[in-house]
């Protein structure tokens, strides 16, 4: 397995595969984080990577923009996906995307059959990358918000600043623990035939933001944060949806952290 991007999720996936006896090769723009240094946004870099390593059985693209803007998305996802597919033509690819591409704002349940709505330029670039992977017979995994050891933006904002994330308290949020995400990708990598198509990757329990803050308030003995009203144009940029992960669970994956 070749893992492109060894950040929060990619590192956990590599460790999981190696513990199970699989060979996990890693590549990252930061040479301190991976076996190979490579920049997916650079065509020559990816061609060089393909020349240096054995032909992988499968590739997992889980690089992150690390909070970058639209140009970072274009380089990493639009250019990076194209460069990867060209350099490793014929190799199955698993592309880590986001449930944000659905762009639903009315709280309905969402499956992989729902249409996607590019509510922002960033989401449009993610959709473009997804389409390229699917056209090549690959797999798209749409992840909810990652959390786990040392990482949870919602809790961090509340604990350190006493503030809530933007959006209404009745907004539905969809999370996935890093270890569960790594386990799901591990499963997809090691199935006899890599399943093409789209898979949602969230825990089994969407929760409203106010419900989460109420739980944290009781747990920590702190007042729950107050929501800040947002103008209508800002509200349209925040998804409000409940994501189903039934398709992935049908393959045998079960989250250790179901809520």
Regions found by a protein language model. Name each.
Residues 32-33, 37-89:
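NAD(P)H-binding glycine-rich loop region in Rossmannoid oxidoreductase-like domains
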Residues 182-233, 239:
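Mid/C-terminal beta-alpha module of Rossmann-like enzyme folds, strongest
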Residues 98, 128-149:
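Conserved beta-loop-beta element that borders a ligand/cofactor-binding pocket
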Residues 82-121:
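Conserved Rossmann-fold NAD(P)-dependent oxidoreductase catalytic core, especially the SDR/UDP-sugar
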Residues 236-259:
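C-terminal amphipathic/interface module of NAD(P)-dependent oxidoreductases
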Residues 124-127, 146-162, 166, 179, ...:
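Glycine/proline-rich active-site loop of Rossmann-fold NAD(P)-dependent oxidoreductases
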Residues 117-120, 144-149, 168-178:
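Glycine-rich "substrate-gating" loop/helix at the edge of Rossmann-like oxidoreductase active sites
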Residues 10-11:
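N-terminal Rossmann-fold NAD(P) dinucleotide-binding loop
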